[in-house]
From Swiss-Prot:
Gene Ontology molecular function, alphabetical: 5S rRNA binding; structural constituent of ribosome
Gene (UniProt): rplY
NCBIfam families attached to this UniProt entry: bL25_bact_ctc, PRK05618.2-1
Self-association state and partner proteins as the record states: Part of the 50S ribosomal subunit; part of the 5S rRNA/L5/L18/L25 subcomplex. Contacts the 5S rRNA. Binds to the 5S rRNA independently of L5 and L18.
One GO term (biological process): translation
Species name: Rhodococcus jostii (strain RHA1)
Protein name as annotated: Large ribosomal subunit protein bL25
Region feature Disordered, mapped onto this chain: 185-207
Amino acid sequence: MSDENRLVAAVRTEFGKGAARRARRDGQVPAVLYGHGEDPRHLNVPSRDFAAILRAHGTNAILTLDIEGKEQVALTKSVVVHPIRNYIEHADLLVIKKGEKVTVDVPVVVTGEAAAGTLVAQDAATISLEADALHIPEQIEVSVEGLEVGTQILANQLELPKGSTLQADEELLIVNVVAAPTAADLEEETGEAAAEAEAPAEEGAES
């Protein structure tokens, strides 16, 4: 594990919303480390360093935690982000061991350009995989280069990295290539929307 994913974690001795707010004020993220039958450990990790790791490696980032001088490898299992202020409020971390398999949701990224006159609809933003805990793919790419109207890509058609297996429904729709709306279609939709908006106004005037 590279040093860039190393975090010095402090064991929490205070709990509750007030303690969590104080920790965040001090530049720390409250976190819980659990797994392998061990009692959950309540920690604080540096918010700036943790956020940088997530930006670089995604939400399934592997961490090397330094807890009171002892190292523990952990998977970032879930992260709660404030909906307005966009800071990390809390994180759940999972103890992992070398050679262990874990199930994770990995982002799906669409690449390439479909045929002219098409529109690419991405129906699934993530895909559930089982992968080696220390070799989780950051993303799964699916190419739509040159695809024609009517083409669909299902989960079982994705190219997965070696050691990863699909856990999602094999028939899960990932990408659907449809006909792009024409100028006439857009004009018709605009006209219908305007007519719908005028109807309530006319009804109100009559009453």
